[in-house]
Amino acid sequence: MLRISSFLCVALSIFSIAADAATASLIEQLTDLSKRFSTAIIYNTSLLAGLTVEPSTQTTLEQTLDLWLTPRQLSWQKTASGIVIFQTATSVPAPAISIPETNNTQVIEEVTVTESLPTPSNGDAYNRNYQQAINYAQQIKSNYVGQSEIAVGAMLNQLPAENLAEALQAVPGISITRDRGEALNINAMGLGAEYQLTLFNGHRLANTENVRNSNQYGQQHRFDIFSAGLFSNIAVYKTTNSSLPSGAVGATVNLLSDDPLAYQDNNLQVMLTTAALEGEQNLQPSFGLTGNAKTADGNLAVMIKMNYENRLQRQFQFETWHWGENGGAPQPYQWPDINKNILVPTDGLALTIENEDRTRATYYGALAWQATERLKLNTLWFRSDTDFSFDEHRISINPQSQSAQAQVNDENNSLNQFVFNAVNAKTSREESNLYYANQTIQVDANWQPSAHLPLTLSPFYSSSKANSKTKEPITRVHVATSPMQADVALQNTSVDNFNFTSNLGLVSSYSHISQMSKRTINVLNEVQEWGIDSHFSAENSWGLQALDIGFLHSTQSYHYARKDISLSPSALEQLPNLDGRWLEPIANQFSAGFMNAEVQPWLIPKSDLLQLYDIDLPFAEMNESDRLNSYKVSFASKEGYISSQWQFEQVTLSTGLRYSNTLSETQGSQLTKTGGVAPINSSNNDSAWLPSVNLKWQPSQYWQWRAGFNRALNRPNYSDLNPKLHVNSGGLPYAELGNPNLQPVIANTSTLSVNWQQQSVSAQLLGFNHHMNNFIVEQAASFNYQGQHYNSLQRTNDGQAQVNGLQASSQWQLPQYSQWFLQSQLSASITHINKADVSTSAGNHFKVEGVSDWTGNLRFLVSDKKWQAAFNINYRSDFLEQRDISNNASSYVEDYTSTDLSFSWFYSANASLRLDMFNATNETLTRTAKTDYASSLMKAEEFGRRVVVSLSLRI
């Protein structure tokens, strides 16, 4: 579906040997034919070796194949992966073609694929056989000139993964960022999620946004809207491709839909799934359906996919929000007789139970029409609807130093034991119902104006819209505890004690309701793109092979609206006294591996007290705070490109140049000098020339060397452009200010790699270096708001950054067979970042946020005809999550290893049963607050193991 010209712009690098004028090698002629018509041609090399043909004067692909193959008892047939050539059986009709599924087949040795990257199609053999999917992906990668990775079929759906981001961990160099135990964003090429770009058939996707709190991801794509098996082909460009939209310094992930016309038969596949969280009895059902149909003449085809999923999650957390050096902490949080460099908590210490109930429905429809031999029309509709319900229970302590004692952990230079004699504590409940929707519509055409001219024109239109909102206002209710003593003791990665002397199960342990508030957030992100791509293939075995020219008009709009309201202090005082009508016990005992002592149950406010007691808390017109937190950002881009590919003996050269001109506009509100709020509109125009040069040298059959230079740009996050004022609600007083004048980050990236590939083993070593100008960094200044002095933090383009690293990967089909299994595959990848440093004009030096020094993935799969078992291990070393330039300590995510297991039983070709276990080791994810001299436990999270059972039926 939607064969986009980005995959047609690179010609195949198969080496040619000159033939005499009368005849030429059939293999050479097929190679030229593949390049001329931009079509994959798959054949057994030994079948065609030594055959020669006369150059064809026919004008169509079909006529040429018939002319060359029929006299030699050869036939051809279109399949999902391209045109397959096979030997005609004597007196027997030609069979339907698929790549053999024999476990020991060496596909790379036997099959030649004349295509640079996968077309948007779905090969059945690659979906069901992991080894063949690996081999096919390796072959495609081998033919591409630049730095890329391919994931097809079984690589995405035969290893355990809860969503598409987790499936993408099979791609060397990609790591993930987790939220609530599930992958949310991807990281690649030594850079965090904000430097990656996700495309759908070569076009930008609108992004859903976090609306549960004030954190905003902006252009960081949230992968929790995609199930793991939704796509069968994914291309990951590790360096820029001139024919694709600009916007990524890191990797560009291109999600490719299926081509309905590629399927030979009508099919219907149903998947029934149930899941359960460890220790829970509630089963979570899921349902999936995939179907395709084609008319008798084979010119019109349709495909539909539908998936419904329910997910229950319970997460146990110890969390703090801010730690700072004692000497710079606010007065209530300073501890006397303690060194000023000792880390102390400047905000709450809390235990939290987070209950999540999520339902996700995904719909996908594609229609393809081969109107004429030279004209094909494609349409696609995709929609994802996700509902989240959160019920969060928390008991927290305000760690003020008055009437309290503390002990210093000399090893970490931080406070780690606290005794609060008259503790300032509260129990809280937050309830939220959130809605995330993404809808994408795409239309394109592939038209060859003349049968005598190898030119293809591909006009396109894409519209993507994402809405993220609170279905009902988020409600927060805080209840203060009565005076009592509390004890807290922390270790580096665990909690020894979090206890209160009074019985928290009694209503008498609580004094009054201290806060009732509501919040609504509505975010609308829209992307529209239209343009045309053109591809010209030259019929030369030397020199120019392909030329691509295109134009893109793209508009992105982002509207963030937030409103807050709280019950006034006077209204809170008028509420009735607390009794059993207001509070109820927590439904689940707090139990986590990082907790070294039993936690007594506590009471929480009853669900939805505002409605239960008719407490009127309506939203009025937007106040100053609402206007400061709401904003609009839009980008309007016009881009054009030209790219070419050249063949010289053992060297293939790909060059490209893209021009981007973008008008950015920001609408918001900003404080005036007199303390009022005034609207502000800002616009900026940026343009950039983005060249790319990639070289591939193949000195022998098994070795390939690649070198490249690319320039790319990365636009600022939407929230950074908002001329906002966000005042921190806890810890040190500081304010965040937006900057609508931010410029895009410009990066020059150079790469060098070597690939070694044999029948059953392949390996790659890649070195890369990013040099980034206009790097966005935070700067601090003094600010006064409503009589309070704040340190203001504002992002500027004052930085320069350099990131370089090495990436090694290997695929190995193990030469071990037994009566128990026929195939075993080991895949491994590791990335080491040697340098990830930022420098500013003021002489400051620090690390790039979101970058781990080490990431790795290990996958092992063993199978027989009737079963398959696999494990997937992913590792990510500690990294700087958020740098703090005020007195607060920076936050780091500690190293984390996730292990997922899978077992499948194939009853028949049409029925299979699968068991997955996610987070098998149930490792705790921890965050640490750090300065140059001290560290302390900041947060610990435990997600629990999840077991999923799936039944797949094909009709």
Name the predicted role of every residue range.
Residues 19-95:
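N-terminal export/assembly leaders
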Residues 30, 34-37, 89-157:
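Short, acidic, small-residue-rich periplasmic hinge/interaction motif at the N-terminus
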Residues 136-141, 145-148, 165-208:
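Extracytoplasmic beta-strand/coil segments of soluble accessory domains associated
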Residues 204, 209, 557, 701-749, ...:
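Surface-exposed extracellular loop regions of Gram-negative outer-membrane beta-barrel proteins
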Residues 213-220, 229-236, 243-334, 355-363, ...:
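Outer-membrane beta-barrel translocator/receptor signature
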Residues 423, 427-430, 436-438, 625, ...:
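Outer-membrane beta-barrel signature, preferentially recognizing the C-terminal barrel domain
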Residues 762, 767-772, 776-783, 788-883, ...:
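Gram-negative outer-membrane beta-barrel transporters
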Residues 875-882, 904-955:
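C-terminal beta-signal and adjacent terminal beta-strands/loops
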